Amino acid sequence: MDLPIGTVLGDNYEIIRPIGIGGMGSIYEAAHVTTRKRVAIKMMSKELAAHPEALARFRREVKVTTELAHPNIIEVVDFGASPTGEPYLVMEYLDGEDLEARLERDGRVPLPIAVQIIKQVASALSVAHAEGVVHRDLKPGNVFLLRTDDGSIFVKVVDFGISKVLRAATTKLTMARAVVGTPEFMSPEQAAGRVDQIDHRSDQWALAVLSWHMLSGRLPFWKPDVNGILNQVIAEDPTPLAPEFAGLIPREVDKVLRRVFSKKREDRFPTINAFARAFEAAAATAAPARAAAPGPAPRPSGRQPGRKGLWTVLFAIALIGAAAGWMYRVEITSASWWPDDFPRADRAQPAGEAKVAPDDSEHRRRRPPRR
């Protein structure tokens, strides 16, 4: 639904302006009617709210994001439903841009800034992994960049809508041979539909793709069709970056990425923070004068997608081959779309400190910039 300016949702949030339209619905800037604190409201479209799978994704995003406490993960402050039944999610307001917009504008990200981004994304996801949650859709559009007072980058990881909770019992949300995510950023186990093999190392693969994309301005796996991308992810290796970007990307970075791009999960780093530390150490071997030098990305052979060319797909692979198509396999009663035992944010008691990976102390002490 389109919300007119001035509409008040849940007696608490006054709509200020529309921000944009996403895959799940519309996003608005709003303000709390009492405190006037700015928030962002993500409202699901009426059409998608009628589909059980889409509704389940939205519900999962609410539950997972609210339970994960980390300064580099977007904060959910409330949720509810409109008078006509569309669910909405109230989040902290982020003033900045996503990494996808940054890459579209600048082509590439200088190595030192890429290191900042990788460390913070890894820090955020390490907390999710410690709680048994795998993001499964890490990509530039889900990495938001805030500028701090000292000019550094502060990262927020967003959209846990298709995350996988490893400790949960198997449900109809996760079917055997199901492929979920964005093809260009999928790990081989995701691309092959091996759902039982998807774990924290799958997110590590996606972060390596993100790293490659930032450094080169292009994707390591790209074909003009979905099946072509998936087959490439499963069977092919990307070309090393160092020879093409001599002086900008050291060979040690290639070595780190090559390890993460192993088709075997056990050959990757044991944790996503271990990958980030190895990447930072490898980046430190770059020549200081040229490591931060920006420049246009070389144009790859063949067309690669821009902002509108990256798509997220949710499709099932048939036993005899790949077949794309939306899955709506979850039965949910629409009377109450959030769990009965899951309190609303305005009634919740302060949560205890989240369990975090032991090597995450540096970024847990960091806090986002004042806005």
Please provide the spans of the model-predicted regions.
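Conserved short submotifs of the Hanks-type protein kinase catalytic core
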Residues: T84-D98, R102
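Conserved N-lobe loop of protein kinases adjacent to the ATP-binding glycine-rich P-loop
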Residues: A31-R38
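Activation-segment/catalytic-loop signature of the eukaryotic protein kinase fold
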Residues: F79
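Hydrophobic/aromatic scaffold residues of ePK-like serine/threonine protein kinase catalytic domains
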Residues: E67, I117-I118
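C-terminal lobe helix-coil module of Hanks-type protein kinase domains
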Residues: K119, L125-S126, T182-P288
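Activation segment of protein kinases
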Residues: A49-E53, L146-D196, P224
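AlphaC helix of the eukaryotic protein kinase fold
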Residues: S45-E67
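Protein kinase glycine-rich loop
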Residues: I16-G22, I27
